[in-house]
Amino acid sequence: MKTSKHFFSLEGIDGSGKTTQIDMLIDALTKEGYSVVKLREPGGAKISERVREILLDTNFKGIMSDKTELLLYNAARAQVIAEIIQPALDAGKIVIADRFAWSTFAYQGYARGLGADLVQRLTEITCDGCFPELTVVLDIDVQRGRARTAKRGEAPDRLESEKAEFFERV
């Protein structure tokens, strides 16, 4: 097995094709003999997945404060870094994340209006130097992304159910 200590992330709104591109990349890297760890954010570790459930729960729509949302995303990220990302990198694996800190800047910093300065301060504490060396942003028209998401046939989660204007700010 080939070793590498690389950490990459893909960013974009829901329906932009992140997961599809990540799966194709992982397939190609695995065929070349690399050990690859895939994770999604929020999630990827047991505690982080529980935090994800809270963040996406439609029962909290209109109840969860923007700062709570920001702190929960950072809590999930801190856990997945400690439990999954850093150990994988230390073991010479490639880590590919379906979203990472840039989503927090876009969603909470800009779309929620909390500001880049606050997000930056929390991100520095949360990540403690563990950042992707490359992030690819998949840009797609909001309406096209929403149409793709709707084709999945799943009920929209708390964030997916935001108005189009929210995603335009993202």
Provide a role label for each language-model segment.
Residues 32-127:
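ATP-dependent small-molecule kinase phosphotransfer cores
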Residues 104-170:
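A glycine- and Lys/Arg-enriched "phosphate-lid" helix/loop adjacent to the NTP-binding pocket
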Residues 1-5:
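Phosphate-binding P-loop
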Residues 13:
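P-loop (Walker A) phosphate-binding loop of NTP-binding proteins
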Residues 18:
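Conserved lysine of the Walker
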Residues 21:
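Hydrophobic positions on the alpha1 helix immediately C-terminal to the Walker A/P-loop
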Residues 10:
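Hydrophobic anchor at the beta1->P-loop junction of P-loop NTPases
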Residues 25, 29-30:
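Hydrophobic alpha-helical packing residues
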